[in-house]
């Protein structure tokens, strides 16, 4: 409905008719195929990444010369075929290890603490040393500071509401580094160069946890969120989208926005001290190369209006609540999400973002088997 409202505003302002066709949940690809078979084809559609693009690359206009592309803050947020820009992300999200900086700062003041500042956690070895020490001193920390910590990490639940955090988002790290080494964006089969790294961060999650490993199969996403929100854990792998849940007063959580930040997921790779957060998209705009030149230009004009006009930016940033990769979303159109602010700070500090390569994973079965084998 928000896209339809925005399209109506554009039509009222410019006189150009914009029709928005929505698909029922889980039927976007099917709906797109149906619409593409009609005499009047959509001029704008979206794909979720390289796998989605593979089905539609012959329908994607090269956007490299567009004004829309010129407003991108990074080429990390495009889908390319050679030098041709076939898709541009319009929503970006970030994930990493959410942490309670208040508890960590208190820990740093303790005798024999592994670190004296949170900033010292910039690789897997240090993260593990800190988590191990916290796990071994839970009673001491609780007694000294009045917390009710149950573990260093929240439960890494393998219930369907939670397992995507590990078989998709955590699995992205070893895939990213293998792709980075080879200078590729996709492959028919990974070699598993960094699977041992995947295993060691997973082992840390389930060892220094709020629950025993045998309980993980039934632990849910809501339970992990609650554990972090109620200050029962210091570390919690999740993303920027969790901010609204953790700060929603109706949930009754003890943690506040001022308590929270986000650090990278370190897996023990050489040079990871320069790593930032995992930032990417599953929402890319594509302009139909089969449409008329007139319709293509009208579509590009609409998209440029969306990211530059006050009405468009207000809708995207505040009504839809999206974070975008465009340089036009500054000032009042910037997010007040502390996790996004942390991501921006890593970028400002020159840290490299870990791109989302999990969209190249071929199936849910592959994901399930990958966790079984580690």
Where are these regions (language model features)?
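Extracytoplasmic/periplasmic substrate-recognition and gating elements
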Residues: 13, 251-320
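Hinge/lid segment of periplasmic solute-binding proteins
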Residues: 48-105, 145-148, 165, 259-266, ...
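C-terminal capping/gating helix-and-loop segments adjacent to ligand/active sites or protein-protein/ligand interfaces
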Residues: 279, 322-328, 340-373
């Amino acid at each position: 409905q928000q896209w339809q409202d925005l399209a109506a505003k554009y039509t009222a302002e410019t006189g150009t008719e914009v029709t928005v066709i929505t698909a029922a949940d889980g039927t976007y690809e099917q709906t797109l195929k149906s619409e593409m078979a009609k005499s009047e084809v959509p001029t704008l559609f979206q794909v979720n990444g390289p796998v989605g693009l593979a089905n539609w690359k012959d329908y994607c206009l090269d956007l490299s010369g567009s004004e829309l592309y010129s407003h991108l803050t990074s080429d990390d947020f495009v889908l390319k075929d050679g030098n041709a820009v076939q898709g541009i992300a319009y929503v970006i999200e970030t994930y990493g290890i959410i942490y309670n900086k208040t508890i960590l700062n208190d820990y740093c003041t303790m005798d024999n603490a592994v670190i004296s500042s949170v900033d010292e956690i910039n690789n897997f070895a240090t993260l593990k040393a800190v988590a191990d020490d916290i796990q071994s001193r839970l009673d001491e920390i609780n007694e000294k500071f009045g917390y009710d910590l149950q573990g260093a990490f929240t439960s890494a639940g393998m219930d369907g509401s939670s397992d995507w955090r590990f078989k998709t988002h955590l699995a992205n790290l070893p895939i990213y580094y293998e792709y980075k080494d080879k200078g590729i964006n996709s492959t028919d089969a990974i070699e598993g160069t960094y699977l041992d790294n995947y295993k060691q961060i997973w082992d840390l999650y389930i060892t220094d946890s709020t629950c025993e490993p045998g309980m993980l199969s039934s632990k849910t996403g809501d339970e992990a969120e609650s554990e972090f929100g109620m200050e029962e854990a210091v570390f919690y792998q999740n993303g920027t989208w969790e901010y609204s849940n953790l700060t929603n007063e109706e949930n009754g959580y003890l943690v506040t926005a001022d308590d929270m930040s986000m650090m990278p997921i370190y897996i023990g790779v050489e040079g990871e001290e320069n790593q930032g957060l995992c930032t990417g998209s599953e929402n890319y705009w594509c302009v139909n190369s089969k449409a008329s030149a007139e319709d293509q230009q009208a579509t590009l004009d609409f998209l440029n209006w969306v990211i530059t006009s006050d009405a468009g930016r207000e809708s995207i940033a505040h009504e839809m609540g999206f974070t975008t990769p465009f340089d036009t979303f500054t000032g009042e159109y910037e997010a007040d999400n502390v996790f996004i602010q942390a991501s921006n700070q890593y970028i400002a500090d020159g840290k490299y973002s870990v791109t989302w390569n999990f969209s190249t994973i071929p199936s849910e079965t592959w994901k399930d088997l990958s966790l079984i084998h580690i």
